[in-house]
């Protein structure tokens, strides 16, 4: 905690539900006195950072089992950030931390169920015009483990039209442009961003 005192941290922003839960349970107030913890999606919403009407598209939203969004229903937060053209993709993705490695038999069955759900959602999105017949379906999430699991579906569905990504990465691409990541890395490397190794 003393290592970070000079920074006068007011808010810790996290992007992972498991990280959020761990920090909350690990004497957060002792480490960051007088500080609050908030999910990045809810933080962006507080700052009124969201996609404009022109930037909005149809998306599937995968709400992870360990959602970092704690202030309100995650679907409400996601719609506020990305627009109303969002369809929730129910069911666990099957990644579940280490489940895919420790119990691949169970994880595979969970993945098959999720794949069926994605196919249903894809059909509904195309039938209602949320996405075009040849457009990619983007499934967005807030969980690193889920992103890894959802990325596997692109190969499994064999139509090449499914992409998985983080909600904040999709927003960054639309708001900051396709070069946002190299620009961010360059700014960090040039000393424009405070880095702390604890």
List PLM regions with ranges.
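Iron-sulfur cluster-binding electron-transfer modules in prokaryotic oxidoreductases
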Residues: 1-198
